[in-house]
Amino acid sequence: MRVRLELRDLPRFSLFPGQIVCVQGQNPSGHCLVARRVVAAAPPPMPTSPVSSPAFGALSMAIASGPFTCAGDLAYEPFDAMLAHCASTRPDVVVLLGPFVDAEHKTIRGEDDSHPLEASFEEVFAFGVRDRLEKFLDASADAGYAPSVVLMPSTRDATHDAVFPQPPLLADGSVEAPAGVVVACAPNPGTFTVNGVRVMACTQDVLRHLSAAEAARDAAPGGDRMARLVAHIPGQRSAYPLYPPARDACVDAALATHLTVDVTPDVMLLPSDLNPFAKIVPREAAHAAAANAPPLAGEDASAEDAFVAVNPGRLARGNVGGTLARVYVTEGAPEPGKGGKQPHVIAKRARVDIVRV
């Protein structure tokens, strides 16, 4: 039976199509449910590790999201600038999020008559991304620096399947790396562990899609809309909780099980066309925003029950360079006197810089 949902008595809510909610209220007329309380989140637990785990050690990451070249050419100058930044600052991990060969680039689309494309999409990826990355890794090895690299595709990648969720971009060994250097190719969305720290990434612009579809009311002044949108992902236990999906999302519902979020990550990477940001997000933020409950601000949340969300922005924006993100995690001391597994408390130990290239 379908009935209309009346939200006038709720001071705060955040709802969108496809969201799974529990509504408490009354239906006196039989055709309108007057909500008194809405529970819209059941986030999974935060990760924990033994006190001897490397998750309590220091860590640095550089994160960039495509496009990796400017709109007017295929010179990949912003990518060169990013690799130069990494060579000088030496992050432990370099995370590269697609698109690498942007299907929306006018040259790739065949719309640039002055510079027609004379190479295949695979050749563009080879000279624009793979060769540069291999040269960077070889030079780094010669200098005694061995970063790990993670690559994740986008539905806008002209060299890959335009379906979401996506398999990894390359097969293992496609990027020739020096001995001891790890180059991992992750699916989209994907979760990977770096020195014990759990990182989740998704190159689908889920924040922009949720922002366009959300209906919300927030009676509290200064509410953080971006943190609220981010919290819907663990709250709904899905990397893409919106249904029906946005028209450009390329979602294959038959593969929905690959969107499941079974653990709230320490760090969540959500590249978007929206403004770059870094936020501490309480795990229960989506519940507080949707229910008749007091607001939760990042500063007030327990660091043990919060995660770090990062939108690094786009490495290239139009004809100019864009931004990348640097994540620094300081060494942490497990709580004395407690054995077994403990939370990583990354939200308390992390600093994020948005760097312009």
Located regions from the model:
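Extended recognition/assembly regions associated with phosphoester-bond processing machinery
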Residues: 1-357
